[in-house]
Amino acid sequence: MKIGCDLVSIARIEKIYQKHGEKFLDKFLDTDEQKLFKTSSSLAGLWAAKEAASKALGVGISLECSFFDIKISKDSKNAPKLDFSQKILKNFKVQTASLSISHDFGFAMAVVIVG
């Protein structure tokens, strides 16, 4: 098992979104993921989740793992769910993945465990 985590300032993500709008969203979220964006906190949580997932793989966001190789959705209980592209599943031999996202005191944090 490997663990990745990321902590991001919600204000920082909000500022980037205000400056770049949809272009910022299109850079790291697919159309389904963009529907999860309701507030600056949720947007920062999505950013942190993708960063944490890439760190759990040991490569960060890179040619080996792009933002679009990581898919965030919600499960039947509305908890965040993490899926990887077939490329990632094969190259990193991922069998399981767990994601937790939290927001508090102006920060969003995500923790990912892959096995």
Regions found by a protein language model. Give the residues of each.
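Core catalytic alpha/beta fold that binds nucleotide/phospho-ligands
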Residues: M1-G115
